[in-house]
């Protein structure tokens, strides 16, 4: 009786076993014990409000029922990310009252940039002094200070991360929009485009420094369609519009930034092979609500929900939550629209909770990620798994 031939090549057998083990490992979801976030108002859970001045109602009205310092009527994408891992909402690093840093910290502040801005708060139209270099410095101090508190003991020891959390944590980034905004207010579109390589190189340098402090899993958002925001449409009413009504040239700059950011993230993967980098195309997800709002259950995407006056219900002199005087002398509180749950634009520059939840639902699947890995598997090195699976 003849038996079928078997391939006893040890190299092929070992490759097969490694492939199976790796694929099994990849099916496990990540158990991030903490999240450390860096960015601007898209992910600021109250940092700017703690450092400078609070936001007035109706900010926060939908979910928190009070103003928390978030630039929305409710939760941000970073809040939904925390919820998805059963982690508490991130306390702002700058908040000295009631903060709990056990499961991470938020270093983002509204108005933050990658590079040092030319005009800083409290100057009129100023940007945050807590640009990315400063956020990195804050994180660098946070690590030893938090561990000193843990070692000292007492009631505060349980409010800071354990040492191993820093390597196992998820590191999220959403920054760059304000660098482009500052450029648009002071430079030509062509000149802003020319600043992009320096911006992404500066971003990369900070990511590498954060890596040197122990970070290993990076979740990086590109920037959104800034030309669809009503503050840009109001500032530059003469700009050519696309089919969605967005300012084409300004979105093209955002796309140029995103292209260069994706390139620099690819280079980071090569330079730091022990880390995992997921690049998230938040631009495409956000633009879908401007180009096809009804398809996704939204309406009037270009019109500000909490605003006053003008074609887009937005005026820089009548911001959300402010009190303004009408032409007839009547005092008017700039309040929310009737149904924020079906609106996209909250205050002219930021998004509603409903939009933020939609964005999270889309990006968490991995459909807009490079590599295409779901958020809950972002700790796995999918490039290695692909290589093994193809053996």
Curated annotation (Swiss-Prot):
Protein name stated in the entry: Esterase
GO molecular function, one term: hydrolase activity, acting on ester bonds
Active site: 41 (nucleophile), 347, 350
Signal sequence region: 1-26
Organism ancestry: Eukaryota, Viridiplantae, Streptophyta, Embryophyta, Tracheophyta
Sites where a glycan is attached: 186, 193, 313
UniProt KW keywords: Allergen, Glycoprotein, Hydrolase, Plant defense, Signal
Alphabetical list of InterPro entries matching this protein: GDSL (IPR001087), SGNH_hydro_sf (IPR036514), SGNH_plant_lipase-like (IPR035669)
EC number: 3.1.1.-
Pfam family, any one: Lipase_GDSL
Chain segments annotated as coiled-coil in the UniProt record: none
PANTHER family assigned: ESTERASE-LIKE ISOFORM X1, ZINC FINGER FYVE DOMAIN CONTAINING PROTEIN
TM helices/strands, residue ranges: none
UniProt function note: Has lipase and esterase activities. May be involved in plant defense.
Organism: Hevea brasiliensis
Family the entry assigns: Belongs to the 'GDSL' lipolytic enzyme family.
Keyword Ribonucleoprotein: no
GO biological process: defense response
Major enzyme class: hydrolase
Modified how: The N-terminus is blocked. Glycosylated.
